[in-house]
From Swiss-Prot:
Protein name in the entry: Small ribosomal subunit protein uS11c
One Pfam family matching this protein: Ribosomal_S11
Subcellular locations according to the entry: Plastid, Chloroplast
Disordered: annotated span: 1-22
Biological process terms in GO annotation: translation
């Protein structure tokens, strides 16, 4: 008489596991956000779904060392190693922020063997928007 209720949880779990394992993206987008305190590297597919990510903090750097170029290089290497294993060959790079890790992260990306279509600077620049914070007096 009554229809059986499908188990949503089991279907959802199988869908997530199949997405994680069978993820082959030959082209992707690498987002590098370099602030003065940290560098975050996120690798997405062309639709914007995150495939891999890493930051200087997750690589074991704490405190002021997270903002260093070496920490950014390590974070970029960790994020890209995972997607190269999944078969990514080409990528576009979007760099955002004024941090020290911009060039180091780009150097690590170039050394990884991924062919870069283009490198774009997407740092947000205000057209005289909000008032900046006051200058520090030390």
């Amino acid at each position: 008489m009554t229809k059986p209720i499908p188990k949503i949880g089991s279907r959802r779990n199988s869908r997530i596991s199949s997405r994680k394992s069978g993820c082959r993206t030959p082209i992707g987008v690498i987002h590098v956000q370099a602030s003065f305190n940290n560098t975050i590297v996120t690798v997405t597919d062309p639709q914007g779904r995150v495939v891999s990510w890493s930051s200087a903090g997750t690589c074991g750097f704490k405190g002021t060392r997270r903002g260093t170029p070496f920490a950014a290089q390590t974070a970029a290497g960790n994020a890209i190693r995972a997607v190269v294993d999944q078969g990514m060959q080409r990528a576009e790079v979007m760099i955002k922020g004024p941090g020290l890790g911009r060039d180091a992260a780009l150097r690590a990306i170039r050394r990884s063997g991924i062919l870069l279509n283009f490198v774009r600077d997407v740092t947000p620049m205000p057209h005289n928007g909000c008032r900046p914070p006051k200058k520090r007096r030390v």
